[in-house]
Structure formats: structure tokens, C-alpha cells
């Protein structure tokens, strides 16, 4: 599939400098691009590549001023990175997710309702009383349990598992191996030291435009719902326990674990390997740095938390400075103690 530079510029709302009729067939990094490629320049440290790239066209910011001659055509836009990401999304939609129709063998219960325009891969399973929207792509070996609801335009990649009663909004992406709706980790200790399983009869709800990474696991609620709200993005290998609530447009990076009934606000950022205790809350716009532990509720919005247990970023930085100086401070303290305890000379 090919497009002209002018066609790309019109899609992005940009202006062209150079040959607007040149044809584009693929996307590439600016340092590796060859003829027929489209690339972008968002980080100024990559500017030297602009003067040597083989790309046919490069997306740049509106106010960028080249310091040397540029062979490639330029498309000027307000935000090069955002514009390039839109093109990547379009490319993915027309290549990876362009599948349509039904592959055999696959299973669909007679009571299931499946909208048109979608795709069902071989060995996929759709259970009783499911309602699947328009243009939903269900890749091979995906499992959609009984009574699930999936909104229009959602993608369920190969091997993903949606337990019964899971609700997924529109335009969501559930990557390979993700499991939504498995039992929460609920066990009641018994007098003899054993544990009695507590039935988990709730479900999982994803609102619109949520992304779930590969092999992420989101447990169903004990009662009610485990909820991921609109626009939030969950990375690979994240564990969300029963009754967790994640706010709107929050991002959670890989290997993070959130214990039961924790509540995360809107526009939060949890970096990799964060741990969060159960029944605590994070205020909106909280950032938790990598490998930090959150053990208590944070009520103030906009804080950056660091450390285990996590506390205010600036306080933690000061504490780290003192920590690194502990050997020196210990020596000084011993010297002071020795001087104080030494007998006075007559």
C-alpha cells in the first residue's frame, strides 16, 4: 500500500516542503530509513540523522529550522511524535488487524450474539449468551466465557482468556495470554491452619479504550466488579487483584502487583515492579517510581512517590543522600563520642 507525501500531510493536518508527489510505502527509524520510507524527528539529539537519512519524507515540528540542506521532503506538524504515532496506529490497523471473517474450526454458542464486520480465528470459543459488538477481532485460541460483553472495535489477541461475565468496552485491546476474571486470591484461615476458599462471584469490567498487556492477569471481584476505567493502559505481566479499581487514563508498567480492593485514581503513573497494599488508595495524578511500595493511602494529588514503603519523592531523595553518607557520619559520631568521654587533662 502506497501513499503520496501530500496524502500523508492531509491526514496529519501538516504542510509539505519538498516533493509532495513522492510515494511512501513504509515507516522506518530516521537513522535506518531508505527510499520510500517515512520517518519523524521529535528528539533534537537525532537531528544529525536528518541530513544523512535515506527517507523520502520526515515529519518535523512547525518551528524546526534545519542547519544543513535536507534531501528528504518535510511534513511540518504541531507535534511530530503524536503525528507519527497516529500513522503507526493506521499502519497497524491496515496490516495486523485487517483480518475479517470466520476461520474454522471455531465455536460459537447458539445463544451468542456476534456483530458483523469482525474476525474469529481458528479454535476460538464464544460461550453462551455472549454479546459481541461490531468489528470485533477475536484471534485464534481466544476464550470468551459465558455471558461476556465485548464492545465495538475491540481486539482480543491469541490465547487471551475472558472468564464468564467479563465486560469489555469499545476499542479495547487485550493482548495474548491475558486472563480476565480468574478467581481473586481469597481464602479464610481455619482453626486447624488450613484455608477455606472464599467464592469469588463478581466480574471484571473494562471501560472504553483500555489496553491490557500480554500475560497480564486481572482477577474478578469477590462481590461487584474489578474495574479498569476509560483509557487506562496495563502493561505485560501486571497483576490486579479482586475488587481493584483503576481510574481513567492511568498507566501501570510491567511486573506491578496491586492487592485486593486497592483504588488508583485518574491520570496516575505506576512504573515497573511497583507493589501496592490492599484497601489503600492513590489520589489522582500520583506517580509511583519503579520498585516502590505503597502501603498507605495517599490523599494529596500530584505527588511523586519513591521508595519502599513509598513516600514523598523529595523527602526520599534527601534521605538517600543521608543514607550514602552514613559511614562518614558514623566515623564523625564516634570521634565526637570519644572526645566527650575522654577524661579532662589537669
What are these regions (language model features)?
Residues 40, 101-312:
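Structural signal for interior beta-strand "rungs" in well-ordered beta-sheet cores
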Residues 1-105, 171, 177-178, 183-196, ...:
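Terminal amphipathic alpha-helical/low-complexity segments used for targeting or macromolecular assembly
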Amino acid at each position: 500500500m502506497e501513499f503520496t507525501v501530500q496524502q500523508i500531510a492531509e491526514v496529519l493536518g501538516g504542510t509539505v516542503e519538498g516533493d509532495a508527489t513522492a510515494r511512501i510505502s513504509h515507516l522506518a527509524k530516521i537513522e535506518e530509513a531508505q527510499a520510500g520510507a517515512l520517518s519523524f524527528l521529535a528528539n533534537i539529539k537525532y537531528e544529525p540523522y536528518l541530513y544523512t537519512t535515506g527517507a523520502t519524507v520526515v515529519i518535523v515540528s512547525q518551528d524546526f529550522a534545519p542547519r544543513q540542506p535536507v534531501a528528504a521532503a518535510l511534513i511540518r506538524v504541531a507535534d511530530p511524535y503524536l503525528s507519527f504515532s497516529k500513522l503507526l496506529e493506521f499502519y497497524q490497523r491496515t496490516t495486523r488487524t485487517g483480518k475479517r471473517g470466520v476461520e474454522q474450526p471455531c465455536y460459537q454458542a447458539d445463544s451468542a450474539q456476534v456483530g458483523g464486520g469482525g474476525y474469529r480465528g481458528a479454535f476460538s470459543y464464544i460461550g453462551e449468551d455472549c454479546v459481541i459488538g461490531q468489528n470485533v477481532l477475536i484471534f485464534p485460541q481466544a476464550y470468551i466465557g459465558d455471558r461476556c460483553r465485548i464492545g465495538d472495535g475491540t481486539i482480543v489477541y491469541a490465547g487471551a482468556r475472558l472468564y464468564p461475565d467479563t465486560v469489555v468496552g469499545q476499542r479495547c485491546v487485550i493482548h495474548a495470554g491475558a486472563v480476565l476474571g480468574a478467581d481473586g486470591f481469597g481464602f479464610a484461615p481455619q482453626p486447624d491452619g488450613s484455608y477455606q476458599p472464599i467464592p469469588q462471584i463478581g466480574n471484571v469490567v473494562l471501560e472504553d479504550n483500555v489496553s491490557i498487556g500480554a500475560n497480564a492477569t486481572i482477577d474478578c471481584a469477590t462481590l461487584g466488579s474489578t474495574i479498569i476505567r476509560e483509557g487506562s493502559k496495563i502493561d505485560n505481566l501486571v497483576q490486579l487483584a479482586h475488587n481493584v479499581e483503576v481510574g481513567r487514563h492511568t498507566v501501570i508498567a510491567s511486573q506491578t502487583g496491586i492487592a485486593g480492593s486497592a483504588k488508583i485514581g485518574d491520570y496516575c503513573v505506576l512504573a515497573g515492579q511497583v507493589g501496592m497494599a490492599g484497601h489503600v488508595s492513590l489520589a489522582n495524578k500520583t506517580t509511583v517510581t519503579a520498585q516502590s511500595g505503597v502501603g498507605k493511602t495517599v490523599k494529596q494529588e500530584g505527588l511523586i512517590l519513591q521508595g519502599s514503603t513509598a513516600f514523598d519523592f523529595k523527602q526520599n531523595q534527601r534521605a538517600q543522600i543521608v543514607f550514602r553518607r552514613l559511614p562518614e557520619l558514623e566515623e564523625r559520631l564516634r570521634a565526637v563520642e570519644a572526645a566527650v568521654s575522654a577524661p579532662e587533662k589537669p
